[in-house]
Amino acid sequence: MGSTKTLVTCFLTIILAVSLSNHNVLAIDAGIKGFDTDHCDTRCYGRDECMNYCIKAGFPKGGQCGSLCIPCGFKCCCQK
């Protein structure tokens, strides 16, 4: 019974580690495709707020939330 509990705990830990690592990769890839990363200077608090910020800042195509790196957090990236 003790070995079964240990085996289940190990299995669940592996599943958790794999799911978290995949999430981080998706967050990096999804954020900045097609956008110029030079204009990611403001924290992103939502898609609509980012779009409005970029339009007011002079980027007529708007913007999108993106992350340049995992510890950087999400920034509002404006499109030229």
From Swiss-Prot:
Disulfide cross-links: 40-78, 44-65, 50-76, 54-77
Keywords for the protein's UniProt record, in alphabetical order: Antimicrobial, Disulfide bond, Fungicide, Plant defense, Secreted, Signal
Organism domain of life: Eukaryota
Signal peptide boundaries: 1-27
GO process annotations (BP): defense response to fungus; killing of cells of another organism
GO cellular component assignments: extracellular region
Cellular localization per UniProt: Secreted
Record-stated family: Belongs to the DEFL family.
Record protein name field: Defensin-like protein 46
Species annotation: Arabidopsis thaliana (Mouse-ear cress)
Upper classification of the organism: Eukaryota, Viridiplantae, Streptophyta, Embryophyta, Tracheophyta
